[in-house]
Amino acid sequence: MTLKELRLAAGFQQAEVAKKLGVTTTAVSNWELGKNAILRKYHKKLAKLYGVTVEELIGTMPQG
């Protein structure tokens, strides 16, 4: 699954994820588009939010 698919499967809009993590909606969008890497400090929070392991989350990140 992609980051976007994980987010949608968890039932969140980008704005909701951004608010829960304390980042901008643009940051979440850029993560999903592979424009920016997710900072390590958000890995655990985002994985928990999406109901996956950190390893599964990292596996969805585009390789640039």
Where are these regions (language model features)?
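Recognition helix of helix-turn-helix/homeodomain-like DNA-binding domains
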Residues: 23-38
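Short basic helix-loop element that most often maps to the first helix and adjoining turn
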Residues: 2-20, 45
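DNA major-groove recognition helix of helix-turn-helix/homeodomain DNA-binding modules
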Residues: 41-56
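Conserved hydrophobic/aromatic packing and binding residues within compact polymer-binding modules
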Residues: 3, 17-18, 28-31, 57
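Short amphipathic recognition helices of helix-turn-helix/homeodomain-type DNA-binding modules
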Residues: 56-64
